[in-house]
Design a protein with these regions (language model features):
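Basic nucleic-acid-binding interfaces
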Residues: 1-25, 33-73
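Positions that flank functional sites
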Residues: 30
Length: 73
């Protein structure tokens, strides 16, 4: 499936449904962390639109497939 265009805030909102929690913000980047092991940390830019390459990379780091991400609406 094709990746949707989402903002940084929308990305964080969707990942909260998978157990990620907002930790803090450093400049224009939001830091989120998985609440259970392996406590994966992600740095998400707070932009209006995330580039599809960056979005794919963040999903890979989070261990979430594109299809799974799309279903998290």
């Amino acid at each position: 499936m094709k990746l949707p265009v989402v903002s940084g805030k929308e990305f964080v909102k969707r990942l909260k449904k998978k157990g990620y929690d907002f930790v803090h913000q450093e400049g224009s980047h939001m830091i989120i962390r998985l609440q259970t092991e392996p406590y994966t940390k992600l740095s998400v830019p707070n932009h209006k639109e995330l580039d599809r390459g960056l979005l794919r990379s963040l999903l890979k780091d989070a261990g979430i497939s594109v299809d799974e991400f799309i279903k998290l609406k």
